[in-house]
Amino acid sequence: MKSLFRNKKGYLKCIILLFIASVIIACDKYTVYHTFQPIPQKGWLRQDTLLFDVIVPDSQTYYKLSVEIRNRNNYPYQNLSLSICYDGPEINKLPADTLKATLANKEGIWQGDGWGGLYQSTFSIGSIKITKSGTYLFKVAYTLPDEILPGINDIGIKLER
């Protein structure tokens, strides 16, 4: 009975060690900010601009900005057009960038990673230069004519050094 208990303790220690190792490996020293905002199940309303408050610790640095889209099978289009802008301590709202994200190919096959009806795609916006540390507000809105846009599950942004 003692050897069985000892083995369980060993398994538990091994599981804890693997968990800690995976957390350490998963941490990316280059990622400054990475989060998603959920979209209601009924759809994304035209007037609902997504806001992301990003604390940027380093100034005089170029950052890579990416947008991540999680869509469901019921998204009715091949593409999603987004307007992305940001403002911060040293700037008043820069002109918006427009992203035309291709979510499905011409045959209707979803291009993102995923399964079970949920797919995630990542799109690079490019590099932005931050000249002053502080809090920056990133705004994301869709530019399609629909008043309610179904089939989008989450929108995320990622800022990397």
Predicted segments with their positions:
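Short beta-strand-plus-loop segments that form exposed binding edges in beta-rich domains
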Residues: 68-71, 139-146
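Bacterial N-terminal signal peptides that target proteins for export
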Residues: 2-15
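C-terminal motif of bacterial Sec signal peptides marking the signal peptidase cleavage site
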Residues: 23-26
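Short coil-to-beta strand junction motifs in C2/discoidin
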Residues: 76-82, 151-153
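Post-signal-peptide N-terminal segment of Sec-exported extracytoplasmic proteins
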Residues: 48-77
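Short tyrosine-centred short linear motifs in exposed loops/low-complexity segments
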Residues: 60-63, 124, 131-142
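An anionic, turn-rich surface loop/hairpin at beta-sheet edges
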Residues: 99-129
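Bacterial signal peptide processing site
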Residues: 28-31
